[in-house]
A protein has these predicted regions:
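Structural and coupling elements of P-loop NTPases
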Residues: 1-727
Length: 727
């Protein structure tokens, strides 16, 4: 299908830029988002995060705490204005920018994950003082996972201690990026007043008398900056030539490389994820944003150049030689002339509009009143309203087009990760994947009359947030909520009170342990036989089990031969195998990373049914867990501590007492930066302890890293606290 742009859309396919803004907490993402809206003319007054007035921080909790909690989508426009003597790839062309501002706190990493899944590019923001921080590394991995091209913005170059070269070195060494500057700050701290445009070898100078940063001039480089600019240009050419054959040929032959050629090569390398352009400035001081927007247009992909959207059939093609099911895939081309296909990437309950389903349209056009088909539920639903989103402000539109990010009102059965299409489209887009929860706690309403109200509210919140889970403890009857950290659950409880008018008591936070296996078992049987007159129950499943690779969950291969288990019962077998993973045999925690082959079984012509085979599969899994060396896993956190050098010894000693493995230590000026891997179980109360040890001068951040086996000497007390070994 050709890439066709409808005449009704606001901008053609080639003039769309869908990108997100991501960083470590306090990197300045929302401040940058606010400036983008200001300089593109979407807003006419800048709101500051510390005043609770930023456009994209619209939740009460965001305004009170000064942090971003939920991703916010906005749509605006940008036109590259010509500058004398400067090359810009798309002068005087109007571009539509769909921008998502994402949270920086690790507890809300799901918002970053689902945003990067549907975006074509990203600006990754770095603090000019702190450089690469733990959540920056997580964001970088997420962008790499979804093959998202990115531009780096080194922010806060006005702050004391800001060092552009240090951050550049961090990006190259800690993130492994092939990166080079395209816009270098002129000055730093109080003297920050412009940028070197490396490609054009010009100076962008901001007017001293314009605090809003709207007035600047493009000038010849002053003599004292010419050598620095020339060295940066040579480094830029060299690094792009390393990954771009067209530029490499010119570079090696020492042919002249003009600005249009170099920009086109940078664009090609950036879109191919082989090169990362870096810009520096200060969002808070309104310096460097217009040139950054030009870079977004110049170097991030259009809809026609973005990574291809691949859909996978929901109907199996049969088994491969290893017993795994295979499915047909095909590529979707962005076009307004094709049947629509969209991905639901977020749900949100708006108190005025109702339930919103946020979508990214990959191809086709969806109109208000259309019926969309969901391959997961195999149900059709009517599109009641279509909304263009500007943070928390919604505007009704009649249609959304290929590449648009919008919201649908009226869908009752859609959830995060669902594909929405027309007709019987039995293909699905890849859904975003989310990390496991690491912390849980009991919650109960203050009054028994609010129990049902609380349950409904928690279910609604869990539908919105895939990293928030709710379950009932079968032994105690308590409601258990689980999430990514204490702040995450604190916000949930606060939303219960504010939005749903439910006051709740909470228990002490608990670690969300996991279980896995360390050995293999070749043949383990699970059997259900109830035959005492009348129609009975008969299911017989035999499996082989072995440890899987970390992070793979459960992999099932069907190696049944000769019809030992009829095909009509295999879905029930799969359901039982998956259900058994919810509770291991060490302490009843969920099980991870197991490979299972279904190798044999038997059935009864009369007494066999789906439930019998599901139960037999569960029994087989439980029996196999016990034989395969089950162990307990605990969440390990990546922790970074920034402390005055004189407190380094005390901080190190305290980390060692917390079973930490210190991975790296570096000194920057009078500060020491410690990077360590620490069990989450040892980090409760750390905020208070680190303040005491450093007289309030040290700070830390942490994020989930991985799961590791609990030391044998600690397993017994964890099992005891859980209430004994699993039955």
């Amino acid at each position: 299908m050709a890439n066709v742009s409808s005449p009704d859309r606001k901008a053609p396919l080639e003039r769309y830029r869908n990108f997100g803004i991501a960083a470590h907490i306090d990197g300045g993402k929302t401040t940058l988002s606010e400036r983008i809206l200001f300089y593109t003319g979407m807003i006419h007054k800048i709101g500051e995060v510390h005043d609770g007035a930023a456009t994209t921080d619209w939740m009460e909790q965001e305004q009170e705490r000064g942090i971003t909690i939920t991703s916010a989508a906005v749509t605006t426009n940008w036109k590259q204005l010509p500058s004398e003597g400067c090359c810009k790839l798309f002068e005087n062309e109007n571009f539509q920018l769909n921008v998502i501002d994402t949270p920086g706190h690790v507890d809300f990493t799901a918002e970053v994950e689902r945003s990067l899944r549907v975006l074509d590019g990203a600006i990754v923001v770095f603090c000019g003082v702190a450089g690469v921080q733990p959540q920056t590394q997580t964001v970088w991995r997420q962008a790499t996972k979804y093959n998202v091209p990115r531009i780096c913005f080194v922010n806060k170059m006005d702050r004391v201690g800001a060092n552009f070269d240090n951050v550049l070195n961090d990006i190259r060494t800690k993130l492994g990026a092939n990166a080079a500057p395209i816009l270098i700050p002129i000055g730093s701290e109080d003297s920050l007043h412009g940028q070197i445009d490396v490609v054009n070898q010009k100076a962008i100078i901001y007017a001293d008398n314009d605090r809003m940063g709207s007035t600047y001039t493009v000038e010849e480089l002053p003599a004292e900056l010419k050598d620095k600019a020339a060295e940066a240009l040579e480094d830029l050419k060299s690094r792009v030539a390393d990954v771009d054959d067209e530029l490499a040929e010119l570079y090696l032959m020492e042919e002249p490389i003009d600005a249009p050629t170099l920009k086109a090569d940078i664009r090609r390398a950036c879109i191919a994820n082989k090169f990362v352009p870096i810009a520096g400035g200060s969002a808070f001081k309104n310096k460097g944003i217009q040139a950054l927007l030009d870079a977004v247009v110049d170097y991030l992909p259009s809809l026609l150049e973005a990574k291809a959207a691949v859909v996978t059939s929901t109907v199996s093609n049969g088994l491969d030689e290893n017993g795994y099911e295979t499915f047909e895939t095909k590529v979707l081309e962005p076009s307004d002339d094709d049947k629509p296909v969209a991905l639901a990437f977020k749900l949100w309950a708006d108190k005025f509009v109702g339930s919103l389903v946020f979508i990214r349209v990959y191809t086709g056009v969806i109109h208000k009143g259309d019926t969309v088909y969901n391959p997961r539920t195999r149900k059709r639903e009517r599109v009641g309203r279509l909304l263009q989103i500007q943070a928390n402000v919604h505007t009704d539109v009649d249609a959304v087009y290929s590449g648009d990010i919008a919201a649908i009102v009226g869908l009752k059965n859609a959830t995060t990760g669902d594909t929405l299409a027309t007709d019987d489209f039995d293909y699905t887009l890849e859904p975003p994947t989310f990390p496991d929860t690491v912390i849980s706690m009991a919650v109960e309403p203050l009054t028994k009359g609010d129990q049902e109200k609380m349950s409904n509210a928690l279910q609604r919140l869990s539908a919105e947030d895939p990293t928030f889970r709710v379950k009932t403890d079968e032994e105690t009857g308590q409601t258990i909520i689980a999430g990514m950290g204490e702040l995450h659950l604190d916000i949930i409880v606060d939303r219960l009170r504010r939005e749903f008018k439910v006051e709740a008591n909470t228990g002490k936070p608990q670690i969300a342990y996991r279980e896995t296996i360390t050995k293999s078992a070749d043949r383990v049987q699970g059997k259900l036989v109830k035959q005492s007159g009348g129609r009975g129950q008969y299911g017989d499943v035999v499996i082989a089990m072995r440890p899987g690779e970390r992070g793979t969950g459960l992999k099932i291969a069907n190696k049944i031969v000769g019809g030992a288990i009829p095909k009509e019962y295999m879905n029930a077998v799969y359901a039982g195998l998956n259900e058994a993973m919810n509770s291991g045999c060490v302490a009843g925690y969920p099980v991870e990373d197991v490979e299972v082959d279904v190798i044999d079984g038997s059935y009864h012509e009369v007494d066999s049914n789906e439930n019998a085979f599901k139960m037999a599969a569960i029994f087989a899994m439980k029996n196999a867990f016990a034989k395969c060396g089950p162990v307990l896993l605990e969440p390990i956190m990546s922790v970074e501590v920034v402390t005055p050098a004189e407190n380094q010894g005390d901080i190190m000693g305290d980390l060692n007492r917390r079973r930490a493995a210190v991975n790296n230590m570096e000194h920057r000026g009078t500060e020491c930066i410690l990077s360590a891997s620490v069990p989450l179980a040892e980090m409760f109360g750390y905020s208070t302890d680190i303040r005491t040890l450093s007289k309030g001068l040290a700070s830390y951040s942490m994020e989930p890293s991985h799961f590791e086996q609990v030391p044998p000497n600690l397993v017994a007390q964890i099992v005891k606290a859980r209430g004994g070994a699993a039955k």
